[in-house]
Amino acid sequence: MSSGDPAHLGLCLWLWLGATLGREQVQASGLLRLAVLPEDRLQMKWRESEGSGLGYLVQVKPMAGDSEQEVILTTKTPKATVGGLSPSKGYTLQIFELTGSGRFLLARREFVIEDLKSSSLDRSSQRPLGSGAPEPTPSHTGSPDPEQASEPQVAFTPSQDPRTPAGPQFRCLPPVPADMVFLVDGSWSIGHSHFQQVKDFLASVIAPFEIGPDKVQVGLTQYSGDAQTEWDLNSLSTKEQVLAAVRRLRYKGGNTFTGLALTHVLGQNLQPAAGLRPEAAKVVILVTDGKSQDDVHTAARVLKDLGVNVFAVGVKNADEAELRLLASPPRDITVHSVLDFLQLGALAGLLSRLICQRLQGGSPRQGPAAAPALDTLPAPTSLVLSQVTSSSIRLSWTPAPRHPLKYLIVWRASRGGTPREVVVEGPAASTELHNLASRTEYLVSVFPIYEGGVGEGLRGLVTTAPLPPPRALTLAAVTPRTVHLTWQPSAGATHYLVRCSPASPKGEEEEREVQVGRPEVLLDGLEPGRDYEVSVQSLRGPEGSEARGIRARTPTLAPPRHLGFSDVSHDAARVFWEGAPRPVRLVRVTYVSSEGGHSGQTEAPGNATSATLGPLSSSTTYTVRVTCLYPGGGSSTLTGRVTTKKAPSPSQLSMTELPGDAVQLAWVAAAPSGVLVYQITWTPLGEGKAHEISVPGNLGTAVLPGLGRHTEYDVTILAYYRDGARSDPVSLRYTPSTVSRSPPSNLALASETPDSLQVSWTPPLGRVLHYWLTYAPASGLGPEKSVSVPGARSHVTLPDLQAATKYRVLVSAIYAAGRSEAVSATGQTACPALRPDGSLPGFDLMVAFSLVEKAYASIRGVAMEPSAFGGTPTFTLFKDAQLTRRVSDVYPAPLPPEHTIVFLVRLLPETPREAFALWQMTAEDFQPLLGVLLDAGKKSLTYFHRDPRAALQEATFDPQEVRKIFFGSFHKVHVAVGRSKVRLYVDCRKVAERPLGEMGSPPAAGFVTLGRLAKARGPRSSSAAFQLQMLQIVCSDTWADEDRCCELPASRDGETCPAFVSACSCSSETPGPPGPQGPPGLPGRNGTPGEQGFPGPRGPPGVKGEKGDHGLPGLQGHPGHQGIPGRVGLQGPKGMRGLEGTAGLPGPPGPRGFQGMAGARGTSGERGPPGTVGPTGLPGPKGERGEKGEPQSLATLYQLVSQASHVSKFDSFHENTRPPMPILEQKLEPGTEPLGSPGTRSKALVPGEWGRGGRHLEGRGEPGAVGQMGSPGQQGASTQGLWE
């Protein structure tokens, strides 16, 4: 039909109705037909439109002034049924066709349900469409249309038009008491805001009902992953209490398990203990927004078969098919869906009316005739869970007083998972559960099944044992590249996972994994001489046991041992070693210089124990590596270092005068071979030009022409080698026989004062004009000075020197013919004197830091108090006094390498427990270089300094004698520093001695600090508090053995120590005894130089001293007069080697090289094909004879109860406090062998086992034998048909 105007459509409908009245009770027309079904439901059908429309929209709208909301539904078929309409109110019905371009009106009709039922043919009349008067329509009282069952589910949505409230509010008082349980979905998909709309909906549905103990009782359960009773039927007795409880209802959250919730309602809410009344009608209203994650069919069938009216309300994504499966018939009354939570409000009034009509339409006894009452049934007791393994549990219980037909055993993981069940015969009182997951807590329930229903169940929690790990891991065989591992199998394991990884990985080495079916594995491709961590884990499906590990070390390929060197020269060396015990194919020796510029390789037979390396470069360090090569690879490398000697110089030089002015120079060759040329240079002393000649390397003599008979010469010779090396030059002083210039002898140095040295010598024979003295600090850090001494004197004093400093002095005699050789000697100036008599050289640091009576007041953080024993006062250094001086202000000269640090100290209670430097020298950046540390926490003393290589050397003393320093009394401590050791004395008694490396040169610049904390850095760092009475550095390491510690009363000796000076004042004028010797005064200024004294008498000749160092070059003489031209020289020797020539032709190919080492392991191979299908399992045993069958209605009930797979799921045993945890269960395929892991090498490992026989899903075996026929008269249901 076209989408023409509504007036034409109404006219056609009016004409059709007028022509057909009186033919039958049901109004009919060619376009629209209405029929009234039981419970005042209205069924409508219309003619299907031509073309491809999108469906139909049906609108049932109350007439003006009605307070009810309109009803809109959509359908794909030309029929629909509407329920919940008021029989006495008028409605307007419109049917639209939905197309892609909009909607088009097909039919319109106004009706009243009572008029349609009561109108008769003689009172029928028509009225124009839109008149507003109700149209009388005969009632259709027969059965519903047989096509009704196939009608699509429709959705009720509220109209967007505003409604004007009118009429009284609806109230419902059923003729019989009613027990109403609301089952509300509280899953995460609803949300907090929508859950408030759900609570408003519940309040609107409950509001019309009269609530009381003898009227309507309301209970409510909220569910998600588990079900929770919010209140029972008998908990609240008034409507106000119920509505208040709805408002207080809190959102639960979780997953959607509707089947579990229905079983909870059956087992908990619909029980006499919860307020259920046997005479009351029972109604369950389900509100959900999604599809259940578990089975709902069984629990819903049990509820409906027990006479419970189930209404289902779905929102948004609710599964309509599932709602229809849950609800009681008729589905068009009990199933409702809305598209959004906002539309629940429009459905509330309609749902209240439908529930009320259902309660008014029949008593609670209208259910199935055979439906049993929900009475309490006997239950078993004393559930015992025993014989727990990793995959099985044994259950036993005390049977109920009345034996049930069967027991339903239901179990599932307590933290979520799919429940499983098994049925055992009634007489049994125990069973075993198999195929469980290891280390999993299970909730187990046992339900007795009687003819009248399901009794209360037993429940228990049990945790399966872990899968046992492998035991007794054993290394059956270990080779350099393989490990054979075995172990004892573990019960229940189907295969094993073996992991192998290096104990100390190198780079990106990965862990290797392999799965095996037998308790052994062969791991290959390993590296020799490495530790491997191997672990084995038992597996059963996806489960794994605790891993057991073992460490395996592959043996190394034996390397050579005891590497050594001999016959080391400047260009060759011999390396030797101890051979390996196993047969060696070849020994490879490689060497490379430390700079990497020179390398080489040589190979020796397998039985060789030495090899010669060469040619090498002189004065070069080589790294030598020796490796044994075996047929299976190379051993580890033995490494050593060798340094070649310096290129040797010619030796044993001698000069022989020849006739005329020629002289022959002879020498011993520098090396047997390798010398390319000798270069000889001679230079006359004083004035003259140097001459040079070259001699071939195979000669040992040379003639030097043109030497004057009255001139001395310096002759130098050096050797050049073929590898480019050059020896050190060797010099010889040649003096003709006609010239004699002897140097002075017996040169001696003595220290008169800290700033002067006395030099004396024995004059030589001959007329000496004067002596030339040159002196400078031996360290080379100071300036060089010279002085001339008259020839008549043989001694001189060198003034203005640094104290405690070594000086090198050279003296040469000046003759008329020139200068003699210089003789040298080394001497050291004395340290400053600590005593007036100069008997104790050293440095007084108390004076340097102004810790004296007349100067301490100007120092911040320092206080002075008289000594308890008289004599020297005591100075207290408070915390953070920060006493710091520059090195140059404290030590006018460097410290001698051998010295003694002396201090008299007392540690105070406020002295910190951490280490601090009583005295130390630092660099400019305050890095410690030298000092003494006291650690009150460890009760130890540490001395440290830097050696000549700037490395830190330290010695720590912590014996019992050292601990008393920290007990709060004064103690005198000597730290005697020698060249190779340091000794500690406490109260003049030796405590300990420690070896220590030689001290380097003390810093000339930097700082000296007192009490500085060891961790402190920078100029403003913290310092410790302590008392100090003495701090000296004595320029000797033997002073500790001479000191008598007279400052301490316990160490005083009356014979050697003077009496203490009393600090008390005496009234007597009698002078007392002389006081102790006072401290040395400050150095005075230098006096004016005195007049030169007379020469003293010549002393006796001294002992000949050691040969001195090479003298410094003499002063540059004045240019001489130009000489006459010389004679024509002799023909010179052969010149030096020329430049390198061009490269020669390529040589012949070398011999075939040795086989290289094994390459790295290749990449993993591709995954192998699936294994073959395992053998079919053995057939199960023949089933027992079935029991006598029951009547069909009772058998049907048993069948429904047995399918209640979720009876135990709704039990709230320990579930309210336990969050849901999904358990991943692997789907097993029959007899399929698992895929193997990819192999790492082509070599086959230990063969795997055949796959075990698969387990049929749901734990069923082979079908049992057909049960025998029951007794005549009643056909028995077989066991399989009853319980599947």
From Swiss-Prot:
Pfam families: Collagen (PF01391), fn3 (PF00041), VWA (PF00092). Residues 1071-1127, 1133-1190 form the Collagen-like domain. Residues 842-1037 form the Laminin G-like domain. Residues 1071-1082 have a biased composition (Pro residues). It is found in: Secreted, Extracellular space. Residues 179-354 form the VWFA domain. Residues 28-119, 379-468, 469-559, 560-647, 649-738, 743-833 form the Fibronectin type-III domain. InterPro entries: Collagen, ConA-like_dom_sf, ECM_Regulatory_Proteins, FN3_dom, FN3_sf, Ig-like_fold, TSPN-like_N, VWF_A. The keyword Transmembrane helix does not apply. The keyword Secreted applies. GO terms for cellular component: collagen trimer; endoplasmic reticulum lumen; extracellular region. Residues 122-171, 1065-1190, 1212-1284 are annotated as: Disordered. Keywords: Collagen, Glycoprotein, Repeat, Secreted, Signal. This is Collagen alpha-1(XX) chain. The gene is COL20A1.
